[in-house]
């Protein structure tokens, strides 16, 4: 590609600050906001957004930085999955950025050397955008844009989207500096998630050490269940708890039928995990019948009994919340 170069591009100061892996969700949010502000300064754009994808594919703006004088905020708004089609999301997994320096530029056709062949533009940085996306940008008052992917576990976790009202071309070195900042945050986010998961596992171990103590005090599960189930409900803020020990089932509060418990266990086994979480059983467990239980946490193979397989199901009912959608 013959990339446009501005011989007099403004110098960019490289950040010498190396942030530590955040210790809390609040610190992670602060680092995300700082990233938005740094990218805004580096790019000279009008607005930078952190757009995280939800499990259903919709996206929500979690952080935003705006140039002084730019009005209107997208923070907290949610946008439908169709705004960023599947094929576009796959391209973000292959490329360090996507840039549209001028949304009003007339596209120039590219022809393959071999007659009748279609050139693969997957890694072409200067390819044009689809007419639908260009109309989308025009409706937002955006003349130029840059997007940087946040990839976690091989999946597109979020997009950093930079907008400017008038067409604006950045140099490759400028884009690479922005990429380095976003990748640094990406690595810290990965380590933060890994640390949080380990903390959850360690916390579960401490909790079930307490459960063992309760069982030992009562001598058998049947007599310990009332105290144990109350403690589990309070500790995990659950609406119901079920314990499966071999062929026996114990329940307190809302619960699942043995058939549904088996379906959940099979889904967890298919994903090869001992801690399986879902905030929507209808979405995450195919063929799930309707019930008052909307979400469940399954902790399988608990070390509570050396003679039986022990699985714990923590259930929650439906939680209603408001979603603010962007657009009309």
Q: What do these predicted ranges mean?
A:
Residues 130-131, 253-293:
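A charged amphipathic helix-loop-strand protein-protein interaction module that recurs
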Residues 1-6, 66-67, 151, 158-169, ...:
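Short beta-strand-to-loop transition segments that serve as allosteric relay/switch motifs
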Residues 1-14, 40-62:
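Hydrophobic or amphipathic alpha-helical targeting/insertion segments
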Residues 18-47, 190-256:
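Signal-transducing coiled-coil/dimerization helices and immediately adjacent hinge/linker segments
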Residues 143-151, 296-303, 307:
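Short hydrophobic beta-strand micro-motif common in sensory/regulatory domains
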Residues 51-111, 244-266, 282:
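GAF sensory/regulatory domain recognition
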Residues 105-142, 280-298, 318-328:
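Signal-transducing coupling segments at domain and membrane junctions
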Residues 13, 34, 161, 170-190, ...:
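Amphipathic alpha-helical "output/dimerization" segments
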